[in-house]
């Protein structure tokens, strides 16, 4: 046994897949803890299907998860590191995975992770993943940080496990609490401010204005450049995360992948009372048009995400002309 799954009512097939994912996750945690002692896990080794640079650990993780799922109920394996869906067998499930999220942080000892989602297998490989996120059986992640933790939702709340290093087992912890309605943290890469669309600039301007601004309170900005780490913080204490599309070439639809990253995170957030959108429309009801499709991504406390959508509902010229520096909304 690699993870405690009692009392969750999972089907034998899903439970077996979770055991396999947990076993590989524990192994990757051990490999990461020895980075540099035997090999450089952050060494560049090529590019993936999306054109992003691959690190050695990206490939190690992808190979390990794919091998572990052979002989399981997973018929189709879709990975951010693979050009196409890999057919593993005749099973009833399909699994999408970002084997190693945040790999730019490998060499600086910052939390990285694995993001995954499980769907019922459809009639064909791509059809199993080009579907609404509401059809997920499970969505979750493993975070490799000071603790190695696994967080997953099966559609009823969000469950949380921590790796017991001595026993090699993910121990069940209390479930994640519903997200708070109001918090004072937001996460965005502010260095790209000049490239953002006007609604995102206006939203962030109002937060940065603090107690003297239209929101009437001070906010703190966070940015880790690891989606798993950002998600874990928001699940633990609330807030909102923004990765908008912008005017740079290749960034028009943001950089995060709908299938491998955004859909499973959106599933988690929805199951603690939060919301996830592309800035306007809900991620979970959107249909990706290809495996490696990218999307702008805003998620976290429902009220904050709704506020971002409200900024988008106003025309950019109206935003500038009517509100200027006093902001769009009063708190």
From Swiss-Prot:
InterPro entries: FBPase_C_dom, FBPase_class-1, FBPase_N, FBPtase, Fructose_bisphosphatase_AS. Keywords: Calvin cycle, Carbohydrate metabolism, Cytoplasm, Hydrolase, Magnesium, Metal-binding. GO terms for molecular function: fructose 1,6-bisphosphate 1-phosphatase activity; magnesium ion binding. This is Fructose-1,6-bisphosphatase class 1 2. Pathway: Carbohydrate biosynthesis; Calvin cycle. It comes from Cereibacter sphaeroides (strain ATCC 17029 / ATH 2.4.9) (Rhodobacter sphaeroides). Belongs to the FBPase class 1 family. It is found in: Cytoplasm. Substrate binds at residues 101-104, 189. Its EC number is 3.1.3.11. Mg(2+) 2 binds at residues 98, 101, 261. It catalyses: beta-D-fructose 1,6-bisphosphate + H2O = beta-D-fructose 6-phosphate + phosphate. Pfam families: FBPase, FBPase_C. GO terms for cellular component: cytosol. GO terms for biological process: fructose 1,6-bisphosphate metabolic process; fructose 6-phosphate metabolic process; fructose metabolic process; gluconeogenesis; reductive pentose-phosphate cycle; sucrose biosynthetic process. Mg(2+) 1 binds at residues 80, 98, 100. Its cofactor is Mg(2+). Homotetramer. Gene3D superfamilies: 3.40.190.80, Fructose-1,6-Bisphosphatase, subunit A, domain 1. Binds 2 magnesium ions per subunit.
